[in-house]
């Protein structure tokens, strides 16, 4: 295990110290057959379990939206940093890729609204192992950190749900993908519960 400067949104950078296995490169498992990128990249997903990470990892939620011709993933939330927990905004723009068996690729920016100096840009790759689009998804994600953080790689496997009160039978997923989900960190492990995101203030016209 290696202590590194990072916690991940989907795999996405956050400024924190956490233990993740050291890997030399991204090693994507096989993607699900006939994966529909458009159906997956719409609406909201909640992380409910993660192979690695902290409370922040399993408390993450993501929104997908279309801005012009661009598909954007939004991962605003609280991230651990220097012993504290702080709010960051995260935006990932998908790169063109029509090959369904290839990883989804994104360019990402994560920054602190209160401290402009805390900002990083990085590349994210995502492979969907299984999903029914309406209820759950199992995702492998991998990030290469920027030069200022060592240019090393970090990966994770996440269980996502559309609704927190409608969880799927994990036994079926385990048998299908040969995963050990009970060994994953769970949102249920967060004793104090996940923090609510701050409400966004609408700009008023003068």
Curated annotation (Swiss-Prot):
Salivary gland (at protein level). InterPro entries: Calycin (IPR012674), Triabi/Procalin (IPR005657). It comes from Triatoma infestans. Interacts with host coagulation factor XII (F12) (inactive and activated) (via amino acids 1-77). Interacts with host high molecular weight kininogen (KNG1) (via amino acids 402-532). It is found in: Secreted. Keywords: Blood coagulation cascade inhibiting toxin, Glycoprotein, Hemostasis impairing toxin, Secreted, Signal, Toxin. GO terms for molecular function: toxin activity. Zn(2+) modulates binding to host coagulation factor XII (F12) and high molecular weight kininogen (KNG1). GO terms for biological process: suppression of blood coagulation in another organism; symbiont-mediated perturbation of host defenses. Glycans are attached at residue 55. Residues 1-18 form the signal peptide. This is Triafestin-1. Suppresses activation of the host plasma kallikrein-kinin system, leading to inhibition of the intrinsic coagulation pathway. Blocks host coagulation factor XII (F12) and prekallikrein (KLKB1) reciprocal activation without affecting their amidolytic activities. Blocks binding of host F12 and high molecular weight kininogen (KNG1) to negatively charged surfaces. Attenuates generation of bradykinin by interfering with activation of host kallikrein-kinin system. Belongs to the calycin superfamily. Triabin family. One of its GO terms (cellular component) is extracellular region.
């Amino acid at each position: 295990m290696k202590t590194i400067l990072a916690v991940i949104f989907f795999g996405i950078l956050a400024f924190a110290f956490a233990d993740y296995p050291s890997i030399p490169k991204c090693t994507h498992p096989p993607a699900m057959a006939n994966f529909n990128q458009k159906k997956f990249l719409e609406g909201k997903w909640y992380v409910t379990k993660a192979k690695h990470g902290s409370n922040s990892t399993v408390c993450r939620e993501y929104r997908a939206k279309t801005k012009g011709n661009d598909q954007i993933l939004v991962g605003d939330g609280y991230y651990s940093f220097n012993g504290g927990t702080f709010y960051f905004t995260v935006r990932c723009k998908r790169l063109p890729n029509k090959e369904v068996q290839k990883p989804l690729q994104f360019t990402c920016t994560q920054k602190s609204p209160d401290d402009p100096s805390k900002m990083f840009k990085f590349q994210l790759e995502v492979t969907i192992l299984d999903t029914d689009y309406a209820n759950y998804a199992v995702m492998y994600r991998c990030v290469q950190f920027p030069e200022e953080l060592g240019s090393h790689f970090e990966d994770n496997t996440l269980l996502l749900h559309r609704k927190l009160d409608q969880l799927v039978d994990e036994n079926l997923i385990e048998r299908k993908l040969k995963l050990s989900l009970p060994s994953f960190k769970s949102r249920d492990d967060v004793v104090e519960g996940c923090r609510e995101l701050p409400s966004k203030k609408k700009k008023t016209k003068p």
